Amino acid sequence: MKPQTYLAGRIAVLLTLAIVTPAIGEEKPRSGGILTYMIPADAPPSFDGHREATYATVHAAAPYYSVLIRVNPENPASPTDFVCDLCTEMPQPTDDGRTYTFKIRDGVKFHDGSPLTAVDVAASWRKIVDPPEGVTSARQSFYIMVDKIEMPDPLTVVFRLKFPTSAFLSALADPYTWIYKKEILDRDPRWYEKNIMGSGPFKLVSYEAGQAIRGERNPYYYHKGLPYLDGIVGILAPKQATRLDAIRSDRAAIEFRGLPPSAREELVGALGDKITVQTSDWNCGLLVTPNHKKKPFDDVRVRRALTLAVDRWHGAPALSKIAIMRTVGGIVFPGSPLAATKEELEQLAGFWPDIEESRSEARRLLKDAGAEGLGFELLNRDVDQPFKYLGTWLVDEWSKVGLKVNQRVAPTGPWFESLRSGNFEVTLEGNCQSVVNPLLDVSKYQPSSVFTEQYGNFDDLAAIDLYQKMLHETDPARQRALMRTFERHTLDDQVHNITTLWWYRIVPHRSYVKGWKISPSHFLNQDLATVWLDR
């Protein structure tokens, strides 16, 4: 169906999850109604979940697709609670953890009426794990443990791994792993970039570029009784003021990504108990990525100066009052067992407790590199929260060591195109993941030859080797030691990427929206099958 012109691991993590009254209860769901929700973007860069790494694609198109397994929608904050979507039951691994056999539901249909079988599941997963030439798979590196994918019969899919790893089920539950029709993929593996045709709880009705995407209930959905809603409307709006006004005036019920503290206070103050607020720590942060192919950012001294100039420890409390950022951290989700302690962070460039000492070293490095008073352009995404807030703050921080930085913002599509083509000097980008699993989440910091969404344009065999050792390691203590080495290599020795602050998720929504629970990721739990309206 073409859009018409009218988008686990083993490691236990410590997640903070709070729900402000009125809380989600055990009420009996009601069927019917249309959910209108806001998508904080101008448009998805494409509709292909395998290719993209942005909420703009997930929030627009996830309701129209099925996946093999997913996080439990009743417990989406858990990093280990996975349930079947297209499979019939979660399998136990065999062959010493190297083989996973999934039975596929019989009778599932795509929205065009054709049957969905293991043929389609296997074809979709082969595209994700080993895409054909000219096709991008954003999270291909998540699946380097997969040896082959077999389909012994029309209702069975078998994953055979090269080695056992606790990261596999988390990777399999990634919310972008939509199941496509093999016949279409064989004809054109890029068809799904511009088209939507899945087997999810909702069927596409229309897409008006840059305006809205509309869907209706799939009457043949394979989960009995779902979805509850008759239809959905996603309104695309990059400006926060527009989205807030829509929720305040009840022209929309929710924005699933997250809003800053001021927005929460504004909505609660205006609407009282007509607003429910859900909050969570967020497996998401923004990175500064220098393009190593653009001089002088091929010089580690210049890259190191960029991170040394930034005062994270004093900046975090101030920014947390106006933006969806809160926590100082390294490359690992703060609070998880593999994350650096504050004392360990303070040993890394950019995290020193004495900002004056740090900035003095930044000035020295710039002078040694012949880059005193350097001027450059920071490419940023045209999204208020938190991209433009953080970008403006960074420009000011860098000015304190004599850097002259011009910030250029671009809409989501052109911004991604600039990243992928390497047409930038320094960019602000995200490392936002789904199920909290540090082994997978830090794969972003590998070279682009391994992780296609690494935009630094560098080669680093040492980084690849360190990551592989971590992925194969089964002892938690040794794994943590390897993570510290990998983190120091990435943020201090080479400064391939520069971490800033981790986010905090605040989702205020109309209290009549029920059946949706917050998670540490704005990518999870977005097919909307369990959402219902209490009105």
Residue ranges and their predicted role:
Residues 38-95, 126, 195-198:
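N-terminal lobe/hinge region of extracytoplasmic solute-binding protein
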Residues 144, 197, 233-245, 258-262, ...:
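Short helix-initiation/N-cap motifs at beta->coil->alpha
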Residues 148-149, 205-216, 233-294, 313, ...:
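Extracellular/periplasmic solute-recognition and catalytic clefts
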Residues 54-55, 59-63, 208, 212, ...:
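Detector for C-terminal structural segments
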Residues 7, 103, 116, 137-183:
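Surface-exposed binding/hinge segments that line
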Residues 69-77, 170-227, 231, 241, ...:
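Gly/Pro-rich hinge or "lid" segments in bacterial periplasmic/extracellular proteins
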Residues 36, 117-124, 154-160, 200-201, ...:
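Alpha-helical secondary-structure segments
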